[in-house]
């Protein structure tokens, strides 16, 4: 099964978004990029990969956000890039890496505002995966060998970081249905079923002509 579509996956912590992405990538014969986006950005920017990891989907302050977005929207020269604060460099290098990955062909991109970075691309399907809290607690407790209470605390903190990061760097709201093309509760169909549903959606969308999508 082949596709010409790039799929971005936002996800609640513990919703199995990455695992769902791996199933789709395997079925479509495409690559999945998660932490690999950080490695790619580090290699192309010359910034240490550990720095990307330390800033990965972490919130920043509103002043830095304005500085970053002004520079990104106006374009930047090599000299300007060199003089940027490290948070600024990391953000722009990651966005550039996402675009370059997308330019190489169909793939799955997990997190890191990939949907926003590629909003001008026509062959993109943006997905958000959520799940019932109880299911997420069980999953995280099992994976990390935690008590339910500690698993819940980790979920709340991780989701808060992801939400703050996304809301700062985009003009949208993390987890809000209006921010994505497709939102799915993985608790209802499981990993395999959710992956299949996304694949069916992508395949159907590719088969429908633009003029037939008018409502």
Describe each model-derived feature in a short phrase.
Residues 57, 61-68, 72, 147-191:
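Small-molecule kinase domains that catalyze NTP-dependent phosphoryl transfer to phosphate-bearing small molecules
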Residues 95-99, 168-215:
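NTP-dependent small-molecule kinase module
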């Amino acid at each position: 099964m082949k596709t010409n579509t790039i799929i971005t996956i936002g996800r609640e912590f513990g919703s199995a978004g990455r695992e769902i992405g791996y199933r789709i990538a395997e079925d479509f014969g495409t690559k999945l990029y998660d932490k690999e986006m950080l490695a790619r950005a580090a290699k192309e920017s010359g910034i240490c990969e550990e720095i990307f990891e330390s800033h990965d989907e972490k919130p920043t302050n509103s002043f830095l956000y304005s500085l970053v977005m002004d520079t990104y929207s106006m374009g930047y020269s090599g000299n300007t890039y060199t003089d940027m604060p490290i948070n600024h460099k990391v953000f722009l290098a990651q966005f550039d890496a996402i675009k370059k990955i997308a330019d190489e062909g169909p793939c799955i991109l997990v997190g890191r505002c990939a949907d926003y970075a590629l909003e001008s691309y026509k062959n993109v399907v943006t997905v958000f995966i959520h799940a019932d809290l109880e299911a997420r607690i069980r999953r995280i407790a099992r994976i990390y060998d935690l008590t339910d209470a500690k698993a819940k605390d980790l979920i709340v903190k991780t989701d808060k970081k992801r939400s703050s990061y996304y809301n700062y760097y985009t003009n949208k709201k993390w987890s809000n249905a209006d921010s994505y093309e497709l939102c799915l509760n993985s608790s209802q169909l499981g990993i395999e079923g959710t992956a299949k549903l996304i694949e069916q959606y992508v395949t159907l969308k590719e088969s429908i002509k633009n003029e037939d999508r008018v409502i």
